C-alpha cells in the first residue's frame, strides 16, 4: 500500500516536470534569475515541493531513490518573454520617401527661419573669342582685354580723381588755351552777356545764298531731260534710266559734269540733299556715282579727287553722310554676330567720327566681306577709296577695283533693302523700328540727283 502511494507521487512529479519543461512554458530551464532583496522580503516562506517531502520520507524509511530519475533543478523566477505579434506583409509600415529625406526641410515660425545668406552672383565674363578693333591710328585690329568686374576700395577713389584731373590738365595744355579761357575758383562758369536775348524770338536761322546758276543749253534732248530732273525733287521711278543709255550718252554727260559754269551750284545742291536725306536718298546717290564711275573707266578714263566732276566731287561727302545715318540704326540688334558688329562699328567710327577714311579703307582690305553689312559699306567706300588710292594699301586698291568691276545697278539699294526686310520680319522691338524709320527717311527729297540707274 505504501509502495503504491509512493509510485503515484512519483508519477505525479513526472507529469508536473513534463508540463513545466514543455515548449509552451513561458520560462526556460537554462535561464534563471537570482532572487533580489525585495523578492526575498516580500515573498513568504513556501512549503517544500512534494518530491522533496517524498525523498525525505524515503530516506527516513531507508528506501533507496529510483535509478532512472534525474533530480530536478530548482527553478527560480524567470523573465517573461515578449509577446510575438504577427503582422500581415500588406499592412507593414512604409519607409519614408527619399524625396522628403533629401529635400529641403521647411520650418515654420520665426525660430525656424533659414538664416543662410543667399549665394553671391558671380560677374559675367566676356568670351575670349570676341574680337574688337581698337581705335588705333593705323586702323589695324587689336584685341581688347576682357574687363573684369573688380571692386576697388574707397581709398583709391581719391587717386582716381587725381588721375582724371591730371589727364584733363594735360589735354588743356596741348590745346594751348589762353588764360582767359581757364577757369579759376572765383570766375563764373560761363559768360551770360554773349546770349543775344535783345533780338527777340528767332523763327528762322540765317542761311547764306546758294551759288549762282547760269542757264545752259544742250542740243541733246536726253541730257536736257537729265539736267531738268536733277533740279527738282521727284520719285526715284521718275528718274530711272538704263545703264546702257548712260553708256551711250557718255560723251555728252562728260562735257556737262566737267563744266565749270554751274559746278559750284550743283555740288552745293547735292550736298544739301545728302546732308538732309535718309539712307534711301543716299543709297540712290551711291548708285548714281557707281554707275557713272564704271562708265568712265569703261571708256578709258580715270578719276581723281583733284579732277572736276559734279557727280564724283560729292563722293566723300555722301560716304560720310551714309555712314553717319547708318550708325543711327540699332546695330547691335540688326547684326547679331559679334564679329560682324565689331567690324561695322569700327568702320563707322573711322569714317563718321574720326574722319579717317584711309584707315577704314585699309581695314576693309584686310578682312573677308562675307556678310551683307560689310559688303554694303564696302560699296559706299568704293569711290572715295578709288579717289584716295595713292594713300591706301595694295589690298584696299584691289578690293575697290574688284567691287567697281563687278558692280551692277541696284546692288546698293538691294543690299540695304534685304538687311532691313530680313531683320524686321523677325524683330518686334518698337525702338528698333523707330530708329530704322528715322534713318531710312524718304526717297522723294532727292534734288541734285540726275538719274537712278537700272540694269
Curated annotation (Swiss-Prot):
Location within or outside the cell: Host cytoplasm; Host nucleus
Acidic residues: bias regions: 23-42
Annotated residues for binding of Zn(2+): 333, 423, 427, 432
Motif placement: Nuclear localization signal: 101-107, 121-130, 143-152
Residue(s) at site: Cleavage: 33-34
A biological process term (GO) from this entry: positive regulation of viral life cycle
Recorded superkingdom: Viruses
Sequence segments annotated as region (Disordered): 17-163
Residue spans of biased composition, Low complexity class: 88-98
Effect noted on mutating residue 33 to A: Abolished cleavage by caspase-7 (CASP7)
Modification after translation (UniProt): Proteolytically cleaved by host caspase-7 (CASP7), leading to its inactivation, thereby preventing expression of viral lytic genes.
CHC2-type zinc finger segments: 333-432
Main location: host cell
GO MF, one annotated term: zinc ion binding
Induction data: Transactivated by ORF50 protein.
Keyword annotations of the record: Activator, Early protein, Host cytoplasm, Host nucleus, Metal-binding, RNA-binding, Transcription, Transcription regulation, Zinc, Zinc-finger
UniProt cross-references to Pfam families, sorted A to Z: Herpes_UL69 (PF05459)
InterPro entries attached to this UniProt entry: ICP27-like (IPR008648)
GO cellular component, one term: host cell nucleus
Subunit record text: Homodimer. Homodimerization is required for transactivation. Interacts with host ALYREF. Associates in a complex with RNA, and host export factors NXF1/TAP and ALYREF; these interactions allow nuclear export of viral transcripts. Interacts with protein K-bZIP/K8; this interaction promotes viral gene expression during lytic infection. Interacts with host PABPC1. Interacts with host AGO2 and TNRC6A; these interactions inhibit host P-body formation. Interacts with PRKRA and EIF2AK2/PKR; these interactions inhibit host stress granule formation.
The family this protein is said to belong to: Belongs to the HHV-1 ICP27 protein family.
Purpose: Post-transcriptional regulator that plays an essential role in the expression of viral lytic genes and productive viral replication. Possesses numerous activities that promote the expression of viral genes including enhancement of RNA stability, promotion of RNA splicing and stimulation of protein translation often via its ability to interact with different cellular cofactors. Stabilizes polyadenylated nuclear (PAN) RNA by cooperative binding to a 9-nt core of the MRE (MTA responsive element) together with host PABPC1.
Comment field on protein domains: Binds viral intronless RNAs.
Protein name: Post-transcriptional regulator MTA
Protein species of origin: Human herpesvirus 8 type P (isolate GK18) (HHV-8)
Amino acid at each position: 500500500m505504501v509502495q503504491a502511494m509512493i509510485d503515484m507521487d512519483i508519477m505525479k512529479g513526472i507529469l508536473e516536470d513534463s508540463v513545466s519543461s514543455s515548449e509552451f512554458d513561458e520560462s526556460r530551464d537554462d535561464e534563471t534569475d537570482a532572487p533580489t532583496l525585495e523578492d526575498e522580503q516580500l515573498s513568504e516562506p513556501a512549503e517544500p515541493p512534494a518530491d522533496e517531502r517524498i525523498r525525505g520520507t524515503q530516506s527516513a524509511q531507508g528506501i533507496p531513490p529510483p535509478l532512472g530519475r534525474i533530480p530536478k533543478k530548482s527553478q527560480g523566477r524567470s523573465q517573461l518573454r515578449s509577446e510575438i505579434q504577427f503582422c500581415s506583409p500588406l499592412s507593414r509600415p512604409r519607409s519614408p520617401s527619399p524625396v522628403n529625406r533629401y529635400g529641403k526641410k521647411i520650418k515654420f515660425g520665426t525660430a525656424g527661419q533659414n538664416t543662410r545668406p543667399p549665394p553671391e552672383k558671380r560677374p559675367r565674363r566676356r568670351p575670349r573669342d570676341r574680337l574688337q578693333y581698337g581705335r588705333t591710328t593705323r586702323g589695324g585690329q587689336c584685341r581688347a582685354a576682357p574687363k573684369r568686374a573688380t571692386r576697388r576700395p574707397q581709398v583709391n577713389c581719391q587717386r582716381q580723381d587725381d588721375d582724371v584731373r591730371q589727364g584733363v590738365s594735360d589735354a588743356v595744355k596741348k590745346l594751348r588755351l589762353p588764360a582767359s579761357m581757364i577757369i579759376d575758383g572765383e570766375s563764373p562758369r560761363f559768360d551770360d552777356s554773349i546770349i543775344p536775348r535783345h533780338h527777340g524770338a528767332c523763327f528762322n536761322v540765317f542761311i547764306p545764298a546758294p551759288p549762282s546758276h547760269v542757264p545752259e543749253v544742250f542740243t541733246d534732248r536726253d541730257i536736257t531731260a537729265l539736267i531738268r530732273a536733277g533740279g527738282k525733287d521727284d520719285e526715284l521711278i521718275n528718274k530711272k534710266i538704263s545703264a546702257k543709255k548712260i553708256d551711250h550718252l557718255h560723251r555728252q554727260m562728260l562735257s556737262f559734269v566737267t563744266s565749270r559754269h554751274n559746278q559750284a551750284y550743283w555740288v552745293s545742291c547735292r550736298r544739301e540733299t545728302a546732308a538732309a536725306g535718309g539712307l534711301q536718298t543716299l543709297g540712290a546717290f551711291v548708285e548714281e556715282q557707281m554707275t557713272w564711275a564704271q562708265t568712265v573707266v569703261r571708256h578709258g578714263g580715270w578719276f581723281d579727287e583733284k579732277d572736276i566732276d559734279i557727280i564724283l566731287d560729292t563722293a566723300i561727302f555722301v560716304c560720310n553722310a551714309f555712314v553717319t545715318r547708318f550708325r543711327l540704326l540699332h546695330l547691335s540688334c540688326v547684326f547679331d554676330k559679334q564679329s560682324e558688329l565689331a567690324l561695322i562699328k569700327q568702320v563707322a567710327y573711322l569714317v563718321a567720327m574720326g574722319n579717317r577714311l584711309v584707315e577704314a579703307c585699309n581695314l576693309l582690305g584686310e578682312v573677308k566681306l562675307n556678310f551683307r553689312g560689310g559688303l554694303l559699306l564696302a560699296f559706299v567706300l568704293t569711290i572715295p577709296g578709288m579717289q584716295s588710292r595713292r594713300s591706301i594699301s595694295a589690298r584696299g586698291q584691289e578690293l575697290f577695283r574688284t567691287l567697281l568691276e563687278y558692280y551692277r545697278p541696284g546692288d546698293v539699294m538691294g543690299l540695304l533693302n534685304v538687311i532691313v526686310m530680313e531683320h524686321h520680319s523677325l524683330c518686334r522691338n518698337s525702338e528698333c523700328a523707330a530708329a530704322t524709320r528715322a534713318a531710312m527717311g524718304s526717297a522723294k527729297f532727292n534734288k541734285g540727283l540726275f538719274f537712278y540707274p537700272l540694269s
